[in-house]
């Protein structure tokens, strides 16, 4: 039996924190589905297609090294619906701090009420990944700062290109 987990998020952009969670998750499951949330009304920096390509490029080798299959999908509805579609029995959620825990506990409770067959598993961020957020990465990159300590090299290059095009 294949153990499948869903890791949902915006991944705009993918960060070293996301890779940390992916690495940990791939040690626990046979198949990890990374689900990119696409929500009308939001204006992401990268399109869903660009985010999928960056996730494939950066997370693919991590999953392969850990012996897990990786799939990238998009969703525009509830994460529980995405989990059911891909046959996931586990929601993967990363935790950086107590603020994340409070929010994620509420989310886990709501998801558990809607999809009791899908268990939420919290993975603590490594010390190096704890301060990283995609929001801060976008802000730093947008102001011309060096984000290379916080994101994979391919993402840093795409951020430089994106913000160079806007200046």
Curated annotation (Swiss-Prot):
The gene is coaD. Disulfide bonds: none annotated. Belongs to the bacterial CoaD family. It is found in: Cytoplasm. The record marks 18 as: Transition state stabilizer. Keywords: ATP-binding, Coenzyme A biosynthesis, Cytoplasm, Magnesium, Nucleotide-binding, Nucleotidyltransferase, Transferase. ATP binds at residues 10-11, 18, 94-96, 104, 129-135. Its cofactor is Mg(2+). This is Phosphopantetheine adenylyltransferase.
């Amino acid at each position: 039996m294949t153990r499948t987990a869903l890791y949902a998020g915006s991944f705009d952009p993918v960060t070293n924190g996301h890779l940390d969670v992916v690495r940990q998750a791939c040690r626990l499951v046979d198949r990890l589905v990374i689900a990119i949330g696409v929500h009308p009304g939001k204006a992401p920096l990268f399109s869903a297609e660009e985010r999928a390509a960056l996730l494939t490029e950066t997370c693919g080798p991590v999953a392969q090294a850990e012996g897990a299959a990786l799939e990238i999908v998009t969703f525009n509805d509830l994460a529980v619906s995405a989990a059911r579609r891909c046959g996931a029995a586990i929601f993967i959620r990363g935790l950086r701090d107590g603020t994340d825990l409070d929010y994620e506990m509420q989310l886990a409770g709501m998801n558990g009420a809607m999809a009791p067959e899908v268990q939420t598993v919290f993975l603590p961020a490594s010390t190096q990944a704890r301060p990283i957020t995609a929001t801060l990465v976008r802000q730093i990159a947008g102001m011309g700062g060096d984000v290379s300590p916080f994101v994979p090299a391919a993402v840093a290059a795409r951020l430089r290109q994106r913000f160079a095009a806007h200046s």
